[in-house]
Amino acid sequence: MQFFNTLHPTRPHWLLAALCLIASLLGAGTAQASRIKEVAAVEGVRSNQLTGFGLVVGLDGTGDQTTQMPYTAQGLTNYLQQLGITLPEAQVSKLQLKNVAAVLVTAALPAFARPGQAIDVNVSSMGNAKSLKGGTLITTPLKGADGEVYALAQGSLVVAGAGAAAGGSKVQINHLSAGRIPGGAQVERIVPTPLLEGASITLGLQASDFQTARRVAEAINRRFGAHSARALDGRTIDVTAPSESNARVSFIAEMEELQLESSIPSAKVVINSRTGSIVMNQAVTLGECAIAHGNLSVSISTTPVISQPNPLSTGGKTVVAEKSNIQIRQEPGMLIQLPKSTQLSDVVRALNALGATPQDLLAILQAIKAAGALNAELEVI
């Protein structure tokens, strides 16, 4: 896919050249061969998400305000009880722990992970801690969706940020309420993977496409013999594989390296309505159409009006009122004819000829699609 940011009217030339260059470079790879492992994955071989509630200690006065976050004090009390330290209930509610923060710990348990293997963990503040920088995560069990503990996390946080505050002023760089611990969790339990079950394995395409499914099945049949693979639908391919573990692993390794010609993706335009960015692939074409687009602006200004009583009046008060002025300005839109465009560079050039802002282009593309002149699927995210 080719990416481009829509153009501001005052700087069309350099961006148009860059877009054409990207289109030519990426468009040259439409027939480039790819491996099966890059378009499909073996069903059942996947990572599993782990989560856990933990505490970060050792903060420099930037932890939770425990009077507002009672679960921080409760979590610390439960942890101390495991160490044989019991606090009176009357004291728990009075704890002022500025160097402790309640956090949510997440990790991805990779496929085939074995006990003792280290995995990375992400740590995010759950309360009102100002910063987790310099903190240490105490032992936190990480559980899967079934409620079983699969890993234990602990270690010093790496927070890619900095901040300082004094005299009512505050400066902050990056995010201080989240961090990461490389290799901070140790796997304690194996997740069974059904790789050796049955007489066949199932490949799942990353994107549903009948053409790609057919090509994957044909590539496997050419290498391992007819009827070794069959496409079940636009995403699933059933492959007959050896039953012995070593032979099956070797079979999968060789199968994933098989080359296949990449099919041309279906034409698609993706619009991000929040950022104003637009992404389209090289299959997008544009039919001949005419567009008129005018800008409409509404400006509201408020002017304070002071009303004072007469000099000799009694009981009068000075009143400040506001007078609002509303102006609506609509700029005329010139009708522009867009020619038929069969290449991405031509589509980019035609859209840039409108001189529209990114937000305007969002509406223009939707209108072109509604008129039947945009030969692509339009997706708004």
Curated annotation (Swiss-Prot):
GO molecular function: structural molecule activity
Compartmental location: Periplasm; Bacterial flagellum basal body
Keyword Signal: yes
N-terminal signal peptide: 1-33
Biological process per Gene Ontology, one example term: bacterial-type flagellum-dependent cell motility
Membrane-crossing segments per the record: none
Family: Belongs to the FlgI family.
Protein name (record): Flagellar P-ring protein
Organism from which the protein derives: Albidiferax ferrireducens (strain ATCC BAA-621 / DSM 15236 / T118)
Source taxonomy: Bacteria, Pseudomonadati, Pseudomonadota, Betaproteobacteria, Burkholderiales
